[in-house]
Amino acid sequence: GILSLVKGVAKLAGKGLAKEGGKFGLELIACKIAKQC
C-alpha cells in the first residue's frame, strides 16, 4: 500500500541524502511529496 511505498521512497531518499547531504535533499523530497516543484 501507500505506507510501504513511502517507506521504500524514504529508504532510497535516505541513501541519496547520505551522498548529497543536508538541506537541499530534504527540500527536494518535501517538494516532491507536496508536488509543488
UniProtKB/Swiss-Prot annotation:
GO terms for cellular component: extracellular region. Disulfide bonds join 31-37. Coiled coil: none annotated. GO terms for biological process: defense response to bacterium; killing of cells of another organism. It comes from the Eukaryota. Keywords: Amphibian defense peptide, Antibiotic, Antimicrobial, Cytolysis, Disulfide bond, Hemolysis, Secreted. Expressed by the skin glands. It is found in: Secreted. Its main location: secreted. It holds the Pfam family Antimicrobial_2. Shows antibacterial activity against representative Gram-negative and Gram-positive bacterial species, and hemolytic activity. Belongs to the frog skin active peptide (FSAP) family. Esculentin subfamily. This is Esculentin-2A. The lineage of its organism: Eukaryota, Metazoa, Chordata, Craniata, Vertebrata.
